[in-house]
A protein has these predicted regions:
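Acceptor-substrate binding/catalytic loop of class I
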Residues: 162-171, 192-206
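Short alpha-helix
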Residues: 175-178, 203-215
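Conserved beta-strand signature within the Rossmann-like core of class I S-adenosyl-L-methionine
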Residues: 127-131, 186-193
Length: 264
C-alpha cells in the first residue's frame, strides 16, 4: 500500500526531500485518467503476487536445506540502532558479515521515507528525532582509526562543520564495524562508495582497508562496480556549495579475511 501511495503521490520519487514536481504531476494525471480504481486494484494485486512469490521461493529454499540436514534459522531485527546493537552481540557467532554502511554526507536517509512515515501516523517531532539519530549527524564517542589516509584527509579539512561530520562518520561507522568484526569468524564484505567533501571524493574503501589490516585482518580484494543507473536526479551544480556536482561513478566491495593462528 505504501508503494502504491508513492505512485499516486505528487512527490518526486527521485529527490531526497519532499517536493511536488511537474514529472510527478504528469504521472498522477496519467494514472487518474480513466478507471483509476481498477488500475489501483490491479497494481495492488501485482504487488501482492510478487510478495507471495518471493515468500514461496524463500520457504522452498529453507525446506530444501532442512531436508539436506542443514538446519537454517533466521533472526530479523528492525528499528534497531547498529551502534548500540554492536555492543550486545556474542563473540565469534557469525561466519560472515555482509553490510553496506551509510554513505558519508548522505543528507538524511530518513528523507526518503518521510512521506511514508507521515502516512503511517508519525508526527513531525518524531520524524525529526529519527533524523538526528543518523550518522554522521549524531554525536558519537571518538575511537581509534588506524589509517594514514584517514589522518591525511582529516588534516586537510579546515571547516569545523565538515571536520565534525567527517569525524562523526568514521567514529560511528568504523566504531560499530570494529566491534562487530570481533564476532566474525571468517570474512567481511563491506560495500562502500567514495562520497565527496567539497567535490573531493573521500577514499573510504582505502580507509576501511587500512584500519582493518592494522587490526590483523587480511585484505583479499577490492572489487569495483560502475554505477550505470541512478534513482536520484542529477544537478550540474551543488546548491549547498556552489561547486560542480560530483556523483559517485563507482562503488567498492572490500573483502577482508580473518587471519588464522599462523597469521595466514
Amino acid at each position: 500500500l505504501l508503494k502504491l501511495s508513492r505512485l499516486f503521490s505528487y512527490n518526486d520519487l527521485q529527490r531526497q526531500k519532499l517536493s511536488r514536481s511537474p514529472r510527478a504531476t504528469q504521472r498522477v494525471e496519467a494514472l487518474m485518467a480513466g478507471d483509476w480504481q481498477e488500475r489501483l486494484l490491479s497494481l495492488l494485486a501485482d504487488e501482492i503476487y510478487k510478495v507471495l512469490g518471493k515468500l514461496q521461493e524463500y520457504q522452498g529454499m529453507m525446506a530444501q536445506r532442512n531436508m539436506d540436514g542443514k538446519q537454517v534459522e533466521a533472526i530479523i531485527k528492525a528499528g534497531v540502532d547498529t551502534v548500540t546493537l554492536s555492543r550486545q552481540v556474542q563473540k565469534r557467532q557469525w561466519d560472515f558479515l555482509i553490510t553496506s554502511p551509510p554513505y558519508l554526507q548522505a543528507h538524511e536517509y530518513i528523507r526518503c521515507a518521510k512521506l511514508d512515515l507521515f502516512w503511517l501516523g508519525y508526527s513531525e517531532e518524531e520524524i525529526r528525532a529519527l533524523a538526528k539519530l543518523e550518522l554522521p549527524y549524531r554525536s558519537v564517542p571518538a575511537v581509534p582509526i588506524y589509517s594514514e589516509t584517514f589522518e591525511r584527509w582529516q588534516s586537510q579539512i579546515d571547516e569545523p562543520s565538515l571536520r565534525r561530520l567527517y569525524d562523526n562518520y568514521f567514529y560511528g561507522v568504523l566504531g560499530a564495524l570494529t566491534v562487530l568484526s570481533e564476532q566474525v569468524r571468517q570474512r567481511m564484505f563491506l560495500f562502500v562508495g567514495r562520497a565527496s567533501i567539497r567535490s573531493q571524493p573521500v577514499p573510504i574503501d582505502r580507509i576501511f582497508t587500512e584500519h582493518f589490516t592494522a587490526l590483523g585482518w587480511k585484505h583479499e580484494a577490492t572489487l569495483i562496480d560502475k554505477i550505470v543507473a541512478r534513482t536520484l536526479f542529477k544537478a550540474e551544480m551543488n546548491p549547498a556549495t556552489g561547486l560542480k556536482d560530483h556523483r559517485m561513478a563507482t562503488e567498492y566491495l572490500v573483502i577482508l579475511r580473518r587471519r588464522d593462528e599462523h597469521g595466514e
